[in-house]
From Swiss-Prot:
PROSITE patterns: RIBOSOMAL_L20 (PS00937). The keyword Ribosomal protein applies. This is Large ribosomal subunit protein bL20. Keywords: Ribonucleoprotein, Ribosomal protein, RNA-binding, rRNA-binding. Pfam families: Ribosomal_L20. Belongs to the bacterial ribosomal protein bL20 family. Binds directly to 23S ribosomal RNA and is necessary for the in vitro assembly process of the 50S ribosomal subunit. It is not involved in the protein synthesizing functions of that subunit.
Length: 127
């Protein structure tokens, strides 16, 4: 009896892996053994970085809002505290967009945050 190798399926699987490894350097794109490992690592990195992208963007938004706050004469943490005290619920993504695209609108928010901080401090002194 002939040896059964399931050749069509094996060839298809190997070709698929080599297709995914197209563009990789050297033997990683030519040899199945190394291509399989490279593709698995690539997929793992892609999975991890899809999650890391969220924190990267959050950090970028914070940097942008902080820069705009410093230009307006307030620190980022005081600004965020003031927004919370003023019951302004805007996320960092929207704040960063405002800071970049609409400086006047952002300065209005800074003013509201500063006013809320003053009233918060005044009420804390009374108590």
């Amino acid at each position: 009896m002939a040896r059964v190798t399931n050749s069509p399926a094996s060839r298809k699987r190997r070709k698929k892996v080599l297709k995914y490894a197209k563009g990789y350097f050297g033997s990683k794109s030519k040899l199945y053994r190394y291509a399989k490992e490279a593709v698995q690592h690539a997929w793992q990195y892609a999975y991890d970085h899809r999650r890391k992208k969220k924190s990267d963007f959050r950090a970028l938004w914070i940097v942008r809002v902080n820069a705009a706050c410093r230009n307006a004469g307030i620190s980022y943490s005081r600004f965020m505290e003031g927004l919370k005290a003023a019951n302004i619920a805007l996320d960092r993504k929207v704040l960063a967009d405002l800071a970049v695209r609409d400086e006047a609108g952002f300065n209005v928010l800074v003013k509201q945050a500063q006013d809320a901080l003053k009233t918060k401090a005044a009420s804390a002194k009374k108590a």
